Amino acid sequence: MQNAAPRLTFTLRDEERLMMKIGVFVPIGNNGWLISTHAPQYMPTFELNKAIVQKAEHYHFDFALSMIKLRGFGGKTEFWDHNLESFTLMAGLAAVTSRIQIYATAATLTLPPAIVARMAATIDSISGGRFGVNLVTGWQKPEYEQMGIWPGDDYFSRRYDYLTEYVQVLRDLWGTGKSDFKGDFFTMNDCRVSPQPSVPMKVICAGQSDAGMAFSAQYADFNFCFGKGVNTPTAFAPTAARMKQAAEQTGRDVGSYVLFMVIADETDDAARAKWEHYKAGADEEALSWLTEQSQKDTRSGTDTNVRQMADPTSAVNINMGTLVGSYASVARMLDEVASVPGAEGVLLTFDDFLSGIETFGERIQPLMQCRAHLPVLTQEVA
């Protein structure tokens, strides 16, 4: 029997605030976000991601984001050993969509800021002003050592100093088309970028450490954070509160967008059975590699994203918050997410992206009070 899912009751003022944004974290790497031999096994392709993002756009998702990963975890599943590149993928997706916001991720150790500024301006032109950039400092040392560009372990403690200079160059070039910035990491000499973006370029980040949140508070339009636990949709609230407090120090409005995996079915029991099946097939070899890498950063503190990713509690999906249940239960839990102060959106992954987005759009989203402003849609006819 399907479990009942009581609906939250909001005032009109609450409802105006709780029109939560929904995004999809596209599977740019093989197998998405489940490190399990029991999960769907697939390679990343443009055609797959095109189908995912077009389906997300049909169901009124607000944005799509791709990460960047330059070396995987190995193991039986060869987890994330096969990856597309973020900017070129999102440029292609920008050309085959019309409404959804598109974000690519810049691994800032690999790309000079002037090149990122020009690539972003190009995708702004392709998308008609729907593009933004996610900036990451880089934590997985082997990704950069393999190319001979790891700057040394000192970088762990200086990475946000580096990123601060990086974003200042971007701001110069996007804002005025010119930069003469001089810093410890970058020296611009009458550097030029034209054309400039047609609209102000959104910059996002995923800082969870104090330094990361301070950076986001100063420079980001919003900040990603991990959800926490299984069916504990508001457990991230202290993280959102920290981000809100950091933003208050800069006088800016920087909301939190929370990462969750959705595993849904007709009933709570059926969804739970899928989740347990995935956990039973955990790729222990790949997970061991993740744990080993997470221990190499001894300088950034204990509150970083990678520390949470490697926690053995739910490492099978990198410890992102997981919502497991019937369609009604997942809708209720997402409404709870929207009730947390500072939470302005969620970034969703699915065990099966194509069917997951479809069932989300048709069976979950129509039950969500924080998405009640949207029409109810059925599957798009090809």
From Swiss-Prot:
Expression triggers: Up-regulated by the nitrogen regulatory protein C (NtrC also called GlnG) and repressed by RutR.
InterPro entries: Luciferase-like_dom, Luciferase-like_sf, Pyrimidine_monooxygenase_RutA, SsuD_RutA_monooxygenase
UniProt KW Flavoprotein keyword: yes
Annotated protein name in UniProt: Pyrimidine monooxygenase RutA
Domain of life (superkingdom): Bacteria
Catalysed transformations (reactions): uracil + FMNH2 + NADH + O2 = (Z)-3-ureidoacrylate + FMN + NAD(+) + H2O + H(+); thymine + FMNH2 + NADH + O2 = (Z)-2-methylureidoacrylate + FMN + NAD(+) + H2O + H(+)
Family per similarity comment: Belongs to the NtaA/SnaA/DszA monooxygenase family. RutA subfamily.
GO biological process: alkanesulfonate catabolic process; nitrogen utilization; uracil catabolic process
Organism: Escherichia coli O157:H7
Residues given in the record as FMN binding sites: I68, K69, N134, E143, R159, Y160, S209
Pfam families: Bac_luciferase
Function: The FMN-N(5)-oxide reacts spontaneously with NADH to produce FMN. Requires the flavin reductase RutF to regenerate FMN in vivo.
EC code(s) of this entry: 1.14.99.46
Keywords associated with the record: Flavoprotein, FMN, Monooxygenase, NADP, Oxidoreductase
GO terms assigned for molecular function: alkanesulfonate monooxygenase activity; monooxygenase activity; uracil oxygenase activity
